Regions:
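Boundary/entry segment of secreted carbohydrate-active catalytic domains
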Residues: 1-16
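Acidic/histidine-rich catalytic cores of soluble enzymes
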Residues: 33, 125, 132-236
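A short, Lys/Arg-enriched amphipathic alpha-helix followed by its capping loop at the start of a domain
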Residues: 2-6, 24-30
Length: 238
């Protein structure tokens, strides 16, 4: 049985300097975190603000607090069909690979792209763009010994277990992993327990060994299918 280490997202604690952020996470009883500099660290508005000095402060603060960095969150738009936009987003990830390595992060992580952000683009086109982005990112990750994980979301480009398996099989990279947020697989049409179990069976049997981080959150759906957040107790997620 694999050992699970309980953590929390850094930006759920608000924006702070690295020392305050990691101290707060550790004092809350968590052993690791998902650190997204652009969401959790004061003064960071873009990846250009993630300087070597700031990275060293974060590394030192993490070590002092006993909080590991499980995921270096580099959440960008990997599935833009517009090549100029897509290439710019992939470049952001490439700039952060040395950061993840310096931090000793378990992996880097990103979702793909919300389909609503590019009307008129088909999911197949968005997935092909995702593969092109990963084709730029993964060779650099392999060279520098960093894992890169993608996260499935049912309204994004990579939206089903079938899509995840396609990406893993197509890229065939030893450094490609999966972040699994169970809630993100569940749309209103698959909210029943039986439907969810069919999803979980696919996730576990097809690529369970590729899952490097798991997220938990609560959600449910209004009668019209509108998504809303809940506690874990009130969640429709089985």
């Amino acid at each position: 049985m694999p050992e699970f280490i309980l953590g929390a997202r850094g930006h759920d604690f608000g924006r702070h300097d690295p020392e305050t952020l990691f101290s707060s996470i550790g004092q809350a009883g968590f052993a690791c975190t998902q650190l997204a500099f652009t969401k959790a660290v004061e003064g960071v508005k873009s990846y250009a603000d993630v300087t070597p000095a700031l990275v060293e402060r974060a590394r030192t603060a993490a070590a002092a607090s006993g909080v590991g960095i499980a995921v270096d969150g580099t959440y960008v738009e990997l599935s833009y069909a517009d090549e100029d936009k897509r290439h710019a987003e992939a470049a952001k990830v490439l700039s952060q690979i040395p950061v993840a390595r310096a931090l000793g992060a378990g992996c880097m992580g990103s979702e793909t792209t919300n389909m609503a952000k590019q009307p008129g683009v088909t999911r197949r086109e968005a997935q092909e763009a995702l593969l092109r982005s990963l084709g730029e990112i993964l060779p650099a990750c392999e060279e520098q010994g960093v894992l890169f994980a993608v996260e499935c979301v049912y309204y994004h480009a990579m939206n089903t277990p079938e899509a995840v398996r396609m990406v893993l099989d197509t890229m065939a990279s030893p450094n490609l992993r999966v972040i699994c947020d169970f809630a993100n697989y569940v749309g209103p049409e698959a909210a029943s327990v039986d439907a969810q179990r069919r999803i979980w069976d696919k996730v576990g049997s097809w690529y369970g060994d590729k899952i490097t981080a798991v997220h938990f959150k609560g959600q449910n759906f209004q009668p019209d299918g509108t998504l809303y957040s809940t506690s874990l107790e009130d969640s429709c997620v089985d």
